[in-house]
Amino acid sequence: MADLIMGIDPGTLVCGYALIKVENRYHIHPHSFGKVKLSQKLALAHRYKQLFTEISTILQQESPKAVVLETQYVHKNPQSTIKLGMARGVLLLAASLQDVPVFEYAPNTAKKAAVGKGNASKKQVQLMVSKLLRVPDLLAEDNEDIADAFALAMCHAHLAPYQDLKKTLV
C-alpha cells in the first residue's frame, strides 16, 4: 500500500503544497499539487484563516501520513520572519487537529535530496523535481513554491526511515 506525504512551502501570500505517493520508499509518484493564493488586500489574520481553511480541507480530503515543512529560517527583515513563523503555526495547527504528524527539514537538506546539492537555486530544484516526477507543469515560473513542496515531501520519503519519530513537531 502506498503512503501519501504532503510537503508544504509556507508563505504569507502564496503557499505551495504537493502530495506524493510513496511505495517501498523508492517508488515516488506525484499525487496532487497546487497553491493557496492569499490576497495582499486581506488583513493578515484573514489570510491565516484562509490558509488554515484551505490546507485543512486538503488534509481532510487526502489524509496524508505526514506533513513536511522547512525549518524556520531568519530573513533579513525580522517582520517577514515573524509573519512566516505565524503561517507555519497555522499549518502546524491544521495538521495537529487532524492528527497528522509534522516533520521539518532544513532547506539545504531538501535541496540536496532533490538536486544532489544543498545550495541549489530555486530554478535548479524546479527543473530537477519536474524531471524526476515527470511533471512538466512545474517548469512554469510561478510554480517554484510547488517544486519546493515536492522537494520537501521527497526528502521525507527518503529520510523518514532514519527519523526518530519522537522528533515530530506534532
Curated annotation (Swiss-Prot):
Mg(2+) 1 binds at D9, D145. Its cofactor is Mg(2+). PROSITE patterns: RUVC. HAMAP family: RuvC. The gene is ruvC. SUPFAM superfamilies: Ribonuclease H-like. The keyword Chloroplast does not apply. The RuvA-RuvB-RuvC complex processes Holliday junction (HJ) DNA during genetic recombination and DNA repair. Endonuclease that resolves HJ intermediates. Cleaves cruciform DNA by making single-stranded nicks across the HJ at symmetrical positions within the homologous arms, yielding a 5'-phosphate and a 3'-hydroxyl group; requires a central core of homology in the junction. The consensus cleavage sequence is 5'-(A/T)TT(C/G)-3'. Cleavage occurs on the 3'-side of the TT dinucleotide at the point of strand exchange. GO terms for cellular component: cytoplasm; Holliday junction resolvase complex. The keyword Repeat does not apply. Keywords: Cytoplasm, DNA damage, DNA recombination, DNA repair, DNA-binding, Endonuclease, Hydrolase, Magnesium, Metal-binding, Nuclease. Homodimer which binds Holliday junction (HJ) DNA. The HJ becomes 2-fold symmetrical on binding to RuvC with unstacked arms; it has a different conformation from HJ DNA in complex with RuvA. In the full resolvosome a probable DNA-RuvA(4)-RuvB(12)-RuvC(2) complex forms which resolves the HJ. This is Crossover junction endodeoxyribonuclease RuvC. It catalyses: Endonucleolytic cleavage at a junction such as a reciprocal single-stranded crossover between two homologous DNA duplexes (Holliday junction). Mg(2+) 2 binds at E70. Binds 2 Mg(2+) ion per subunit. GO terms for molecular function: crossover junction DNA endonuclease activity; DNA binding; magnesium ion binding. One of its GO terms (biological process) is DNA recombination. It is found in: Cytoplasm. The active site is at D9, E70, D145.
